[in-house]
Regions:
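Hydrophobic "anchor" residues on beta-strands that sit immediately upstream
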Residues: 23, 47-49, 89
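A short, N-terminal amphipathic alpha-helix
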Residues: 75-85
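Conserved protein kinase catalytic core
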Residues: 32, 57, 99
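Active-site metal-binding core of divalent-cation-utilizing nuclease and nuclease-like domains
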Residues: 23-44
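Mg2+/Mn2+-dependent nuclease catalytic core
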Residues: 55-77
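Acidic-basic catalytic patches of nuclease active cores, encompassing PD-(D/E)XK
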Residues: 1-27
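Conserved catalytic cores of phosphodiester-cleaving nucleases, focusing on short active-site segments
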Residues: 37-58, 73
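Domain-level recognition of nuclease-like catalytic cores that cleave nucleotide substrates
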Residues: 83-110
Length: 110
């Protein structure tokens, strides 16, 4: 996904989360060489580490969420929690953005 397209998708995802009463804690958190977390949000004392994927259709976007990418996200989440000295409930979510809709997949690592 191009950076411009990615930024647009992330803005839509943030707006979507705010509409669901999430508090946006941080966006584009860079965890050194581990990777990046697109959106860190919080709701009901649970931190949500969100990966935003954008494509013309759902299937293409979801297929871009690979095991390797999930592994990097998990490492980035661990780094974030250690850096911020947080011991909190959390989950890793995916937000799939396409032209027509937004799909919110909570706790994708189960």
């Amino acid at each position: 996904m191009s950076r411009e397209k990615g930024n647009f998708a992330e803005k839509r995802a943030i707006s979507f989360l705010k509409d669901l009463n999430f508090e946006i804690i941080e966006k584009n958190f860079y965890a050194k060489k581990l990777g990046e977390i697109d959106i860190i949000a919080k709701k009901n004392d649970t931190y949500h580490f969100c990966e935003v994927k954008s494509a013309p259709d759902y299937e293409t976007a979801i297929n871009n969420l690979t095991a390797s990418k999930l592994s990097k996200i998990k490492s980035s989440v661990d780094y974030y929690l250690q850096t911020k000295k947080l011991d909190v409930a959390f989950c890793i979510d995916a937000i799939i953005v396409n032209d027509e809709e937004i799909n919110f997949l909570e706790n994708i690592t189960l």
